[in-house]
UniProtKB/Swiss-Prot annotation:
Protein name: Short chain dehydrogenase virK
Molecular function (Gene Ontology), one example: oxidoreductase activity, acting on the CH-OH group of donors, NAD or NADP as acceptor
Active site as annotated: 168 (proton donor), 172 (lowers pka of active site tyr)
Keywords: NADP, Oxidoreductase
Keyword NADP among UniProt keywords: yes
Coiled coil (residue ranges): none
Amino acid sequence: MPSYVITGASRGLGFEFVRQLSSDPNNTVIGLVRDKVTTEQAVAQELAGRSNIHILQADITDYEAVKDAVTATAQITGGVLDYLVANAAYISEFDAYDSIGVLGNSPKELEEDLFKSFKVNVIANVHLFNLYMPLILAGNIKKVIALSTGMADLDSTNKFELQVAPGYAISKAAMNTAIGKFHAQYKKDGVLFMSISPGVVDTGHYKNATPEQMAKVGGMFQNFVTYNPDFKGPASPEASVKDVISVWENASIEAGSGGSFVSHHGNKKWL
């Protein structure tokens, strides 16, 4: 009976991971969220009757709260964990539509945003992995997955001229390196660490954007089409999560997947 911990499970891709993984009653699915009450209400309304879902409250930047969540997880699973999925992330609105040079005109805000991006997307995940390692090591499957972004790929950044969201991209690139470091340490113990980009997904991130901001997003999408004529726009969370699960299910240390950073296709094709 595989066990999963999903961070950022209250909405978007995180909630979709909970939905898809809990569809198999043999799976134990644990979601870490900042608002337990609201998330449990959503589960009751949309995933009624699934007794294999457990929601724990923990802001991933709160070390003690995550530590308590590990204790609660162990009580649910009997002290083991098969999959740890680091989905929670800080996606800044400050840097979402501008280049790093433009953001440099607001140096204080830029610095604060970079610090927050690094704290949530890198430091919090490093603590998350360290705290859950005893349970992962005791598990059977031993897979740790971090949700990343194609924007963290240097070749992709240059090819698609990806100027926007620099803080998000920089922090995710740092997280990818952390994944490599963890895998280098725990490969000998049979633990697979890897980063997977979910692709371009419609999670409502741009729903409050101004026409000027959407014009910048449209320009980025046009670059995608130029380099990949098959690009039809953002995928649904359902399709993206299905692809990501397929990638980690097919990944193995023996196949060289450990410490890697791949797309939802399992390769370097980001769209």
